[in-house]
Amino acid sequence: MIKKPNLNLAYALRTVQDNRNLYAAWAKDYETEFAHQMDYVLPQKVAEIFVEIGGVGPVLDVGAGTGLAGEALLKLGIESIDALDLSGAMLEVAFNKKIYKNLFTKDITQPIKTINYLYQGIISSGTFTHGHVGPDAIENLLAVAQEGACIALSVNRDHWFKNGFSIKFQELDDKIERLLLHEVSIYGDNSKADHRNDLAIVVTFKKV
């Protein structure tokens, strides 16, 4: 019997195919069974921080999933948004919301090919976490960003310390500027489940 998708299974993912399988099974009910029940506020917070640092479109929403961060950006006045995710099933849900101009099913641990322009902004909410993506993928994001692009990426706080994100950003010192770390709650006050006290670091910077 296939286990019902949940956060613990998501954190335990090991391979790209494991990731695709879990989110294919979860896509239809992801927002009702996870985002709403857990009071998942991280996408909104990442979008707000992106706008606060001066972020504008066109934006690439990395790990867009069902479009929660895209919806938040749209409400904040950002209208030119593309979506990228490993899960085609999750992007099908996002497509139906009519938020995104273009949608790409891609693995960001590999070089990214989208369309023939670079982005003025990149956001990511919930992708840099346990069982998902490590710090090396950040260089692939920089490759599709314009000079001066604003970038806001959430990183699960435990994942940050366990997987060398601070070291990676030191290595990127000549490629980025205005690096800031913002510690935020992943879930809101209405969350009653395990992990309700989990934190994320929203990393903001500009490409030079």
Ranges and model annotations:
Residues M1-D29:
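N-terminal, positively charged/glycine-rich alpha-helical extensions of SAM-dependent methyltransferases
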Residues E31-A47:
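Conserved SAM-binding loop and adjacent beta-strand
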Residues L60-I112:
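Class I SAM-dependent methyltransferase SAM/SAH-binding core
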Residues Q120-G134:
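A short SAM/SAH-binding and catalytic strip from SAM-dependent methyltransferases
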Residues D136-E147:
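A short glycine-rich, Lys/Arg-flanked "PGG" loop and its adjoining helix->strand segment in the class I
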Residues G148-N156:
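Conserved beta-strand signature within the Rossmann-like core of class I S-adenosyl-L-methionine
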Residues N163-V184:
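Conserved Class I S-adenosyl-L-methionine
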Residues E177-V208:
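Class I S-adenosyl-L-methionine
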